[in-house]
């Protein structure tokens, strides 16, 4: 499978059965903002490249680490390309993250929006909780500056704006904004074939925003 910039820019992430939306949403965000970084940090082993696996650079415990991924590691439960249903570069990155956590999918089933961004980019990400979420203008500025942005929904049940379209305890990529409506656009790692909406629009300046979105992570440009 391709791991160069062109190959990384194309596929659409489909989360699969693992609970690592915090990481996949960050991958999607960096895919949009800096696909070259993703391409640089994955190396195919063997001839042809990838025939003997890959090495992925991730920022783990405060330092860059090369994590090995064997082709046999790419199981049936993980993320795939939503178009083909086959493993993609994101599957390799996902397995690298799991291998960096002792190879146990159960160990990576929950984390914060900022954690995924930091692990992939190696840069500190700002994290905002219900007390002080970004405004529409702040989200817009972050997107315009090319920063990766993800948000997490209420862990029990979103009851604010767009509540019926949001999955509880789930992390979404903030993929864009609509200046005419004052809404940000969230993209769901579950993929376009999911029973849940793939894109959700929500007004971050709505008084009830914090009852739907409880945390935001914003990375460096």
Stretches found by the model and what they are:
Residues 1-7:
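Non-catalytic, low-structured ubiquitin/UBL-interacting segments
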Residues 2, 43-44, 161-164:
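Intrinsically disordered, low-complexity segments enriched in polar/charged residues with Gly/Pro
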Residues 7-34, 52-177, 185-221:
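Predominantly the structural core of cysteine protease catalytic domains
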Residues 36-46:
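Surface-exposed patches in mature extracellular/periplasmic domains of secreted proteins
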